[in-house]
């Protein structure tokens, strides 16, 4: 209801987190002699591409790695023989995010683990969406997959039942005992989102919060943002001190204000709000 998912899609609930989907997507969609395209926008996108190599060929359409993943590549070509294009809609470590649901000549597979339900999404523009619940949806232990029905069973390989999207679809995600409490926490979150006014209202709230933080980062001469302005994430606001030696002092400074856990990822440094 919140995502207005079309009737020709199945919603699957399973365990394993997004890391398992890095493998399950190519396992279910990609044959050994075929190619899947990947847009490299950060560590998680790179991990997904690495897993796909176990099941077929991969092609990286573009990468922002040479510029420390500070932006999302906009200009690239997707080979028409690609089985799918994989994108990571929000990059937690580097603070970049997609804000458009773009269509391509091939099905788009999106890892939306860290921005699902943060804004309205046109599900019809995707072949498959997956999201680990622990960021925006519920507690750890459950992963949501939204898959277009014609993609179920696409790969010809013999499949383990526990790794077969078709098995989950046929059994309403009840092939084995599901993580009931984790699913229940998702239900509570979805009810809360609906009560707030849905995803349009949530997007408005997220924009307001992010703009407030980014305005201070841009104003304050002690800090600078990591991501380029047009690709700045609303989910993960990454910033670094202009003088790296001030990092430890700032972490100590904010403790009396009950601000904890904002230390940035080791490859970027700085802070992450």
Q: Where do the model's predicted regions map?
A:
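Conserved active-site segment immediately N-terminal to the catalytic lysine
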Residues: 109, 123-134
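Conserved PLP-binding active-site segment of the aspartate aminotransferase-like
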Residues: 237-243, 259-273
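Conserved beta-loop-alpha segment that forms the PLP phosphate-binding cup at the N-terminus of a helix
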Residues: 8-33, 37, 45-46
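Conserved PLP-binding catalytic core of the aspartate aminotransferase-like
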Residues: 223-254
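Active-site C-terminal subdomain of aminotransferase-like
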Residues: 133-214, 228
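Substrate-binding/gating loop at the entrance of the active-site cleft, primarily
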Residues: 40-55
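Active-site phosphate-binding strand-loop segment of PLP-dependent enzymes
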Residues: 52, 63-116
């Amino acid at each position: 209801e919140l995502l207005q998912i079309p009737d020709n899609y199945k919603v699957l609930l399973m365990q394993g987190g997004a890391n398992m989907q890095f493998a399950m997507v190519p396992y279910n969609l990609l044959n050994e002699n075929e190619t899947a395209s990947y847009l490299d926008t950060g560590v998680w996108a790179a991990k997904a591409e690495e897993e796909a190599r176990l099941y077929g060929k991969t092609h990286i359409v573009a990468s922002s790695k040479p510029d420390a993943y500070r932006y999302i590549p906009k200009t690239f070509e997707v080979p028409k023989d690609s089985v799918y294009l994989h994108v990571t809609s929000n990059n937690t470590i580097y603070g970049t995010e997609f804000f458009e649901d773009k269509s391509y000549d091939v099905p788009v597979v999106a890892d939306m683990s860290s921005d699902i339900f943060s804004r309205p999404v046109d599900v019809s523009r995707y072949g498959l969406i997956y999201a680990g619940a622990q960021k925006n949806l519920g507690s750890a232990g459950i992963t949501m997959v939204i898959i277009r029905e014609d993609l179920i069973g696409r790969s010809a390989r013999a499949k383990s039942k526990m790794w077969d999207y078709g098995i989950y679809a046929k059994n309403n995600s009840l092939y084995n005992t599901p993580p009931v409490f984790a699913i229940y926490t998702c239900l509570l979150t979805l009810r809360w989102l609906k009560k707030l006014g849905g995803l349009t209202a949530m997007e408005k709230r997220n924009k307001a919060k992010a703009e407030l933080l980014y305005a201070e980062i841009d104003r304050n001469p002690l800090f600078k943002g990591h991501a380029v302005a047009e690709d700045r994430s609303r989910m993960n606001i990454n910033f670094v001190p202009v003088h790296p030696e001030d990092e430890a002092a700032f972490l100590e400074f904010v403790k009396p204000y009950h601000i904890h856990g904002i230390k940035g990822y080791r490859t970027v440094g700085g802070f992450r709000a």
